[in-house]
Amino acid sequence: MIRLISLDLDGTLLDPSGAVTPAAKAAIAKARSAGVRVVLNTGRPIPEAFWFAREAGCDSLVCALGGGALADSATGQVIRRWDIPEPSGRQALELCLHRDIELMIFAGDQILMDPFSKRSLLKTYPFPAFHDNGVVTEDPVAYMEEHNLPLTKIHGDQNPGRYPLKELSALPGLQLTSSNDHDFELVAKGVDKGRALALLSMMYGIPLCDCAGVGDSENDLPMLQAVGTPIAMGNAASAVKAAACRIAPSNGEDGVAQAIFSCLSQAAL
């Protein structure tokens, strides 16, 4: 019996234009009216996760930052955050800066960007929830030290040939993943969407075997491997499809709505 559905955001809940469709909202509302929890599990920062959870009509608990944080959109409380250890965090930042990479540096409740990244991200992330918490600084490392900010995640995009992946992989206490075929995400070792979902589901009193997960990317694999009913989107990577028990249509075909309805049919059994 499915009692909780965990949804990835980009490539899953959001359509190709970056919107939550009316069909997706209707499916979420129907699931919640049937007593099934529906939660977001995203690589996006906490403020954006909150915004989309409200926009879609999801339950208040969210997994954000690729499993790096668990928070409550109803209260604004950050329940748990898993930060990158030092000195690996500083070393990783120094490796990534000044390479013409579009960087998002998630530090506390702020998103740090250098001027190069800000220009690019204005086009990539038009959402007010993102830019309201964005800080542009010439020296992110010095800014973090000055304000005593922890580092939770680094996201790099737009210039794969410049990514220092080999050097980052050699740093202790860190792990690399991705949310599409042209980016990278750096988090603390052991941090992933499955681990965060395990804590979230425990808070709701629901075992993982009674949970479903819906996703499309490499960073969704731990979530899909953790739940009893893993569902891949039609636009998912081949490894994600291989980990799923069934495949929904793509995010351009309201696949997430159909995935939710399939869970409701299973929940009624």
Outline where the language-model segments fall:
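Mg2+-dependent phosphoryl-transfer enzymes with acidic/Ser/Thr/Gly-rich catalytic loops
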Residues: 1-4, 20-21, 33, 185-269
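Short hydrophobic/aromatic-enriched beta-strand-loop microsegments
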Residues: 59-65, 82, 125, 175-179, ...
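Conserved acidic, metal-coordinating active-site core of Asp-based
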Residues: 95, 99-102, 106-214, 218-223, ...
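Structural motif corresponding to alpha-helix initiation and N-cap regions
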Residues: 25, 46, 86-89, 137, ...
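Asp-based phosphoryl-transfer active-site loop
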Residues: 3-17
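Short active-site oxyanion
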Residues: 35-39, 59-60, 152-154, 209-210, ...
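Active-site phosphate-binding/coordination module
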Residues: 19-124
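Short, structured coil segments at secondary-structure junctions
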Residues: 56-58, 65-66, 74, 169-172, ...
